[in-house]
Amino acid sequence: MSYSRQYLRFPSRILGREMEMLHFGHQGYPLICLPTSNGRFFDLEDRGIIASLSHHLEQGYLQAFCVETLDWETFFNRKLELPQRRDQWLLLEQHWVEELIPYVRDEAQNDFLVVAGFSLGATHAVNLTCRHPGLVRRCLALGGPYDVAALGSITGWDPKQAEQELYFINPLAYMSNMSRQLWDQLGGRNTDLKLLTAHHDHCLSDNLRLSEVLNRNGIPHQLEVWEGDHDWPTWQAQIRAFA
């Protein structure tokens, strides 16, 4: 390995704790990496995603920041009622926008921010990108489910209630009402949004549906459907190709 690896901790006033991350590379644009559901900041290294980016890291094209998503405190926290889970996620998003992203940009000394998410991490990446157009310059969403209200089988919430309570963090819902004019006005004109899925990905239909919504509303994006599955080998190949 000829690229640097750092374990970092930094205080979050918003969350009231220290947050952990891994930082790989020495120069290039910052790539924030969001793990799969209930994943940890070290999972993407363990699963070969960082190794897949070795050439990019060695050549100084990018720096990867693997961070926490705290799914067990938000979407999967069955001790909380649905509105409380939503509010916990919104608090996490506030941390990303106001603390994490400025910290990462400062560490990388580069403002061209790219976010990559895997499975539920892709849902977070799309939410961060689409709820804050212009903040993220490129979004790589790999194998994500985008109908958040329909995740009741793994989260325990009622889909009907979730349709109302989670509207503003449910990409398939709120992007249905996002016009191209509003998208551009909010800063999305220069956003490069890529939906990356595979023929045997169980989230394929959500990717097709979201792409259809974006096409209908004239919002630029790229949909890639590869041979493969909802699995690490597919994501390793895709992140290598598009990062």
What annotation goes with each model-predicted range?
Residues M1-A243:
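Non-catalytic cap/lid and distal C-terminal segments of serine-dependent acyl enzymes
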